[in-house]
């Protein structure tokens, strides 16, 4: 059970790091004299979140085989897509959702015996 809590935490940290990177990219579009500070803050936040995720990932790999853990981490596709829709108003096509459903089905197949 601890392994799955770690995996969820890694997924959430990675997703949050991706959102911070998106925000940094948007901050870079601000006028030149306003963009440096917010861009650096968002980039620093991304580095911290992604670094924490990586450290927990290393811990997780002590408990789960890579061949099991890595495919399950693909749940990030769902998290990032939902977060992008919620925070940035991005739209996903039905083909996009079909691809995500295929990924989730694959995750189910891999984790069925765990």
From Swiss-Prot:
UniProt keyword Electron transport present: no
CC terms in the record's Gene Ontology section: plasma membrane
Localization per record: Cell inner membrane
Transcription listed as a keyword: no
Membrane topology: Multi-pass membrane protein
GO BP annotations, alphabetical order: lipid A biosynthetic process; lipopolysaccharide biosynthetic process
Pathway assigned in UniProt: Bacterial outer membrane biogenesis; lipopolysaccharide biosynthesis
Matching Pfam families: EamA (PF00892)
Function summary: Translocates 4-amino-4-deoxy-L-arabinose-phosphoundecaprenol (alpha-L-Ara4N-phosphoundecaprenol) from the cytoplasmic to the periplasmic side of the inner membrane.
Protein name: Probable 4-amino-4-deoxy-L-arabinose-phosphoundecaprenol flippase subunit ArnE
Organism for this UniProt entry: Yersinia enterocolitica serotype O:8 / biotype 1B (strain NCTC 13174 / 8081)
Lineage summary: Bacteria, Pseudomonadati, Pseudomonadota, Gammaproteobacteria, Enterobacterales
């Amino acid at each position: 059970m601890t392994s799955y809590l770690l995996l969820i935490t890694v997924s959430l940290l990675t997703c949050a790091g991706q959102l911070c990177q998106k925000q940094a990219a948007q901050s870079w579009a601000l006028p030149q004299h306003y963009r440096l500070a917010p861009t650096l803050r968002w980039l620093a936040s991304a580095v911290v979140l992604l670094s924490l995720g990586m450290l927990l990932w290393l811990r997780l790999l002590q408990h789960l085989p890579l061949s099991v853990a890595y495919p399950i981490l693909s749940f990030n596709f769902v998290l990032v897509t939902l977060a992008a829709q919620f925070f940035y108003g991005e739209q996903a096509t039905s083909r996009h959702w079909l691809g995500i459903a295929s990924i989730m089905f694959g995750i189910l197949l891999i984790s069925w015996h765990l």
